């Protein structure tokens, strides 16, 4: 997934356009993500995605950044179910050749907001939902709300992907065992702290210090090689 693309001062930010350029993402199955407070801005971004040849689009209903949320972007739209309905139904109705997914939080003020949206979400032909079980007003502070996530998980009829506070192999194992019907787990910030976390989970144990150093050496060499090509 790309960082979200958004409209600023009536135009798509040039930085965001660079992020989704296929030439900058060789060898990656990339899904662009958008964030928008209304249908008009969303359509401007989707038009760019279509121009670039993308067939899958992720809609961000999770960003907690206050300056965006107060304008009903990201998780700031979750308390307004009619706005969510208008945005998502327009995307699907206007673009039948595209596949849409949603990344979201439990709510802005309380987890009942996501539960109130479930009848709408369940009836839409989404490919999947990615859920970060915090409230928008928390930003990244406090604890994830696993009880709130469980309530959503139990009623969600779409493939559901968990995201949030996965920093160790044990964290990933705990979530996958507690929620066995998950379609996937999105590690996110845990990979910044430990780039080998996904590999360690696959292997079932942490890498040795020697193995980690060797893999980091190879990773850096690959980054430099790709940079020289660009």
Locations of the language-model features?
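Glycine-rich, positively charged N-terminal anion/phosphate-binding segment
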Residues: 1-48
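Hydrophobic faces of well-ordered beta-strands that scaffold small-molecule active sites
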Residues: 1-3, 30-34, 57-59, 100-104, ...
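Active-site beta-loop-alpha junctions enriched in small/polar residues
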Residues: 5-7, 35-37, 62-64, 103-109, ...
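Short, charged, surface-exposed secondary-structure boundary motifs
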Residues: 10-13, 139, 194-200
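Short glycine-enriched, charge-decorated loop/helix-capping segments at active-site entrances
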Residues: 17-19, 72-78, 138, 202-203
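Pocket-edge positions in alpha/beta enzyme catalytic cores
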Residues: 34, 76, 208-211
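Alpha/beta enzyme core
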Residues: 43-57, 61-73, 82-158
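Alpha/beta catalytic cores of nucleotide-metabolism and tRNA/nucleoside-modifying enzymes
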Residues: 90, 99, 111-128, 147, ...
């Amino acid at each position: 997934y790309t960082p979200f693309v958004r409209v600023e001062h009536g135009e798509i930010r040039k930085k965001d356009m660079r992020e989704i350029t296929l030439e900058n993402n060789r060898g990656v199955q990339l899904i662009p993500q958008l964030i928008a407070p209304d249908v008009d801005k969303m359509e401007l971004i989707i038009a760019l995605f279509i121009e670039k040849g993308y067939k899958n689009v992720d809609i961000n209903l999770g960003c907690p950044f206050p300056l965006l949320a107060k304008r009903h972007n990201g998780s700031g739209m979750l308390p307004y179910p009619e706005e969510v309905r208008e945005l998502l139904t327009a995307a699907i109705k206007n673009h039948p050749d595209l596949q849409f997914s949603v990344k979201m939080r439990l709510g802005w003020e309380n987890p009942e907001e996501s539960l109130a949206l479930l009848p709408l979400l369940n009836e839409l032909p989404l490919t999947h939902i990615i859920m970060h079980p915090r409230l928008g007003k928390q930003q990244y502070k406090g604890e994830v709300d696993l009880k709130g996530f469980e309530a959503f998980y139990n009623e969600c009829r779409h493939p559901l992907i968990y995201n949030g506070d996965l920093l160790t192999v044990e964290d990933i194992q705990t979530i996958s065992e507690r929620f066995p019907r998950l379609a996937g787990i999105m590690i996110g910030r845990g990979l910044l702290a430990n780039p080998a976390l996904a590999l360690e989970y696959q292997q079932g144990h942490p890498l040795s210090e020697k193995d980690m150093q060797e893999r980091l050496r190879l990773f850096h060499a690959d980054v430099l090689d790709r940079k020289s090509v660009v």
